[in-house]
Amino acid sequence: MNFDVAIIGGGLAGLTCAIALQQRGKRCVIINNGQAAIDFASGSLDLLSRMPSTTYGENRAVENLKENITALRNELPAHPYSLLGAEKVLAKAQDFERLANELHLDLIGSTEKNHWRVTGLGSLRGAWLSPNSVPTVQGNEPFPHKRIAVLGIEGYHDFQPQLLAANLVLNPQFEHCEVTSGFLNIPQLDELRKNAREFRSVNISQLLEHKLAFKDLVKEIIESAQGAEAVFLPACFGLENQEFMTALRDATKLALFELPTLPPSLLGMRQRIQLRHKFESLGGLMINGDSALNATFEGNQVRCINTRLLEDEEITADNFVLASGSFFSKGLISEFDKIYEPVFESDIIGVEGFNNKDRFTWTAHRFAHPQPYQSAGVAINAQCQVKKCGQFLTNLYAVGNVIGGFNALELGCGSGVAVVTALAVADEILAK
């Protein structure tokens, strides 16, 4: 099978890159191994939330994105943002904002500065873009609603309203609020309660989206809110989009917000579903449940790849994009004596002091400190071309968290790296 572009990985980075290419006339295939990290994400995207700490002290929170992305080059020269340059990073981030609006992802935020989003535990976390159904505040501004009811679902343990309510008022932006907590009694979920493994956000949303007892649910929310102006709910209402939440908001006439629960995350799944629908509607091909095994090279180019399900058929393309993610998605593999990228056997880099063949450099002494192994990934140049055996391959690009040289957990930049590198690589391929 021959394509213009073959993309390995169907997560945020792979889908974003594929959509940008399909929109400009390229014929793309995505080899998708299974659920991506986006299915377990909060739904909020971070461009850069914290600056690195050289002494394992407190990481400084980022508010002004342009200023800090520019400063990042001095501290982490191998970070993808440092390689691309601040101007291109911000330009590609703005391109993604336009794409998100086009796809009706219902995201709020901008590259001007970060905002704070409320987490499922009641703390505040910096973010670049968040679903407009998630409660957010800008800087130290007070939350606009004074009376808040945090409502869980009886028997649902992946969202704890009492804990959230107690932690929420500790934040200066919510110290003026009166916060109560309670539980919704939804009889339609009784069947799910019999098996705790099935009582998850996805199962709940699938059961409720048929709106068989919509009026009863509206009545239960109004009564449980007890006169509150705003209601925080677990993200269990509406699997593919926010239409169900919008209908509830209109019917209750309350300021309803939803918060991410323990994974799987409905907020992240909605985004992946909408991105995939867009890609396929543009004529792209997604091969699900398959994984790339190895590649054949000709000089400094990739000629073809082989996959697990298509053993006897090579996938050839003019360009290849590695969007396979990090350890979670098996884009990187760790053995006792080495960390490696399994498909192309690309060169691996990390932060200063990390050696992918020296296990003693993989971890920090303190568990809570940033761990060097989390910065492992493939080496790239300013065009996001992948390095192998010291040479850059001219038709192989890497996007997202398979790239090394930065710790996405420490810096809060995983989503930003995914979409920025994805759109930058799309531009590189289209310019050929």
Curated annotation (Swiss-Prot):
InterPro entries: FAD-dep_OxRdtase_2_FAD-bd, FAD-oxidoreductase_2, FAD/NAD-bd_sf, G3P_DH_GlpB_su. Belongs to the anaerobic G-3-P dehydrogenase subunit B family. Its EC number is 1.1.5.3. Composed of a catalytic GlpA/B dimer and of membrane bound GlpC. Its cofactor is FMN. Keywords: Flavoprotein, FMN, Oxidoreductase. Pfam families: FAD_binding_2. GO terms for biological process: glycerol catabolic process. It catalyses: a quinone + sn-glycerol 3-phosphate = dihydroxyacetone phosphate + a quinol. This is Anaerobic glycerol-3-phosphate dehydrogenase subunit B. Conversion of glycerol 3-phosphate to dihydroxyacetone. Uses fumarate or nitrate as electron acceptor. GO terms for cellular component: glycerol-3-phosphate dehydrogenase (FAD) complex. The keyword Flavoprotein applies. Gene3D superfamilies: FAD/NAD(P)-binding domain (3.50.50.60). It comes from the Bacteria. Pathway: Polyol metabolism; glycerol degradation via glycerol kinase pathway; glycerone phosphate from sn-glycerol 3-phosphate (anaerobic route): step 1/1. The gene is glpB.
